[in-house]
Amino acid sequence: KISSFSVFDRFGQTGEYLKLELKGMLRNKNMRHTFIFSMGFIVLISILDSYTGLYADSFSEKFWSLYPFTLMSMNLVRIMCPEGNYIECLLVRKENIRSLLEAKYYFYSITLLIPFILMLPTVIAGTYPLLLLMGMMIFTAGPVYCMLMHLAIINKVTMPLNTKLTRKTGVETNYVQVIVEMVAMFLPIALVSVLDAFIGSIPTYLFMIIVGLAFILTNRIWINTIYKRMMKRKYKNLEGFMSSR
């Protein structure tokens, strides 16, 4: 049972929401299917990159080394949308929202270890350098996740827990989500390409690691900023969540 994961108890209220995230991943049909699809696709990418020359050019190397990590953040694009089903309960105590945001960040940061491990065959095969994968993983956990989590401020459409997302709920047609997702995917690639051209590969990967670590180490600061901005819009968002159920 999820409640038996006592390892999370040491994190207090944030730990309880970590349990909730894990429970949601296992029981929520939409989140579970997204996760399974992501795992299968990452394995396919790893095999193709390791044993074929299909993605041997410079752009493909950068794109396909980043994509497995951004793929893990697909559920973050709809951050707070599943919670729209019971958002009024969370708002009974405002601190719940901050703890929930922290739990989401920690949970999705930890899950980045999965694509990192699955992509290790590309390192063994000599397709990608280990430093590149480390840079992409840490950069994703840093500025990329910071960008995606800011969607919690404006997301106000409830995502059904067990019905298909093709249902006309407005979740799938949120153009802000699409734009942010595209920026989160292609901005790091553009940044790596430009830096690589000027300072070389290894300094570029080290730069990504340093920037990523800076965001990771300051996560409580920018999560608190997101929380405060959410509280300013809580009634508007609450109305949106309740009307879209």
Segments predicted by a language model, with ranges:
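Short helix-to-coil transition segments within interhelical loops
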Residues: 91-96
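A glycine- and small/hydrophobic-rich beta-loop-beta segment
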Residues: 87
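Hydrophobic alpha-helical transmembrane segments of membrane proteins
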Residues: 1-84, 97-245
